[in-house]
Amino acid sequence: SEAGAAGSVHGSLQTGALTTTFTASQGLLLKIPNMYKIAGELLPGVIHVSARSLAAQALSIFGDHQDVMACRQTGFAMLATSSVQEVMDLAGVAHLAAIKTSVPFMHFFDGFRTSHEIQKVEVMDYEVFDKLLDRDAVRNFRERALTFEHPVTRGSAQNDDVYFQTREAQNKFYNEVPAVVADYMAKISEVTGRNYAPFVYYG
């Protein structure tokens, strides 16, 4: 199930492997418990979501934001794309930013039209992303990985005073996210000639 897949993603990230997964709708909801752990442990995973309606009084396979909005509080940064070309261009931004900031990302797009649309796109070579990759951040991530050579304790129980301090200590990582995303979007814009920014004003 998706719950098991989320556990596998969490375990894989704990051992220093850069990991991603894809899901939608009810499947995303099953990942929520592990999403809290992944975000709380500052593991740079990425979940790609074709955003869809949730089954309530009936099942619906059409696009909606019910699933991703149910995950706002998990600690994952959220990046939305609105076309097949944007998915191509900005999925890489989600990965690059997650690695550089140690904050996991949820990259989502319309779960009916965009996810199933047959469209010509300009594909970027992986070398573009490779040149933008923060190798020091990858090294730091791998050095924090669980290994028999350097055992550590994780997932302990904390009293409220220590728990609060460790939660607050993560703010510096989250505060860096907007600038890092903007920087990577600017670099992707230079390569593609398509303008990207975290927020665009219309009106």
What is each residue range found by the language model?
Residues 1-70, 76-99:
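Thiamine diphosphate
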Residues 68-72, 119-122:
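Metal-ion/cofactor- or nucleotide/acyl-coenzyme-handling active-site neighborhoods
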Residues 105-200:
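Conformationally flexible catalytic loops at phosphate/diphosphate-handling active centers
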